[in-house]
From Swiss-Prot:
Record-annotated active site: 196 (proton acceptor)
Binding site for NADPH: 23-24, 43-44, 113, 145, 260, 286
Enzyme kind, highest EC tier: oxidoreductase
Species assigned in the record: Zymomonas mobilis subsp. mobilis (strain ATCC 31821 / ZM4 / CP4)
Descriptive protein name: Glycerol-3-phosphate dehydrogenase [NAD(P)+]
Domain of life: Bacteria
Matches recorded under NCBIfam families: PRK00094.1-2, PRK00094.1-4
Gene: gpsA
SUPFAM superfamilies the record matches: 6-phosphogluconate dehydrogenase C-terminal domain-like (SSF48179), NAD(P)-binding Rossmann-fold domains (SSF51735)
Similarity comment text for this entry: Belongs to the NAD-dependent glycerol-3-phosphate dehydrogenase family.
Predominant cellular place of this UniProt entry's protein: cytoplasm
Pathway the protein acts in: Membrane lipid metabolism; glycerophospholipid metabolism
């Protein structure tokens, strides 16, 4: 007889493990600590000690007191008793970390936004490549880590194919200031977070080059059209792309200098090259890595993404004026599928 799996409930996920002690991982650990035990894993010993002894993360969230109930560690084995793992590792380091954890049945909730440069895989595709039989979820939406950690109101998409796991994780992570909305569209939730990183750079360029509010609105709306085309080509649902993890995240990161991608783009628009910025930046700007691989995957899918292509040109050193001229001289067309 087949063995019936136990239906998952919020109590089943009492102990949450968080991979990544950067700003986002630390903020998520603070959320998860509201209803249960949390073990937070990171690489830097000095950060681990600061969290455990002084209850701060001096490198990433220096002004925020971290709940005392969070236990930080630099040993992956300390996560062995956790019943679910939130993964907040930068996209380009995701594979190397996932390969170090056991291949078991504990759900992985992917919280990073991006596309692996070498493979062209979204985070959920990458995780499924390593763990083909493991439950995979995506948590994504309009979130600045500092605001989540300060318990300002936040809503996110939590996507998983397994209904009971999705429902249990929502109950476990929901707190008065952090509200997950359910989705079964894992790819759709993943696409939005990856593409918006690149489009946020574009909006930053508009701000830095002082191209005006009209141009920023055009980038957001036409950028969303590119996100929509790309997502649908990968099998995403349009309703997911218009939700928190797609349009919601796009609007947030295209409108604030709290976004690292927006700030990077603003500096590009002001005339600072990619190389000049890299010398000064200690944190990951995921959109820089995502842009060229996103363009490559889009070309393979025959999806037109002119704004993404423009950002690739700017990162490679082309001037804002030349890239803008190319964008505005493209053949006139209908806004959607209507012919001119």
């Amino acid at each position: 007889m087949p063995v019936l799996e136990e239906k998952k409930t919020a109590d089943h996920f009492h102990h949450i493990g968080v991979l990544g002690a950067g700003s986002w991982g630390t903020a998520l650990a603070a959320v998860a600590s509201y209803k249960g035990a949390v073990t937070l894993w990171g690489r830097k010993r000095e950060i681990i000690d600061a969290i455990n002894q002084r209850h701060i993360n001096p490198d990433y969230l220096p002004d925020i007191i971290i709940p005392r109930t969070i236990h930080a560690t630099d040993e992956l084995n300390d996560l062995s008793s956790a019943s679910a793992l939130l993964v907040a590792i930068p996209a380009q380091k995701m594979r190397s970390v996932l390969r170090q954890i056991p291949n078991d049945s504990r759900p992985l909730i992917l919280c990073a936004k991006g596309i692996e440069a070498e493979s062209g895989l979204l985070m959920s595709q990458l995780a499924a490549d390593i763990f083909p039989h493991r439950p995979i979820a995506v948590l994504s939406g309009p979130t600045f880590a500092s605001e989540v950690a300060r318990h300002l109101p936040t809503a996110v998409t939590l996507a998983a194919k397994e209904k009971d796991i999705r429902a249990a994780l929502m109950q476990r992570l929901a707190i008065p200031t952090f509200r997950p909305y359910a989705s079964s569209d894992v790819i759709g939730a993943d696409v939005g977070g990856a593409v918006k990183n690149v489009l946020a750079i574009a909006c930053g360029v508009v701000a830095g080059a002082k191209l005006g509010n009209n141009a920023r609105a055009a980038v957001i709306s036409r950028g969303f059209a590119e996100m929509n085309r790309f997502g649908i080509a990968l099998g995403a649902k349009e309703e997911t792309l218009t939700g928190l993890s797609g349009l919601g995240d796009l609007v947030l990161t295209c409108s604030s200098e709290l976004s690292r991608n927006f700030t990077f783009g603003k500096k590009l628009g002001e005339g600072y090259s990619y190389e000049e910025q890299q010398k000064k930046r200690a944190v990951t700007t995921e959109g820089v890595f995502t842009a060229p691989v996103l363009q490559r995957v889009a070309n393979k899918l025959k999806v037109e993404m002119p704004l993404v292509s423009a950002i690739c040109d700017l990162i490679e050193g082309k001037s804002v004026n030349s890239v803008l001229e190319r964008l505005l001289s493209r053949p006139l067309k209908g806004e959607y599928s209507i012919s001119v």
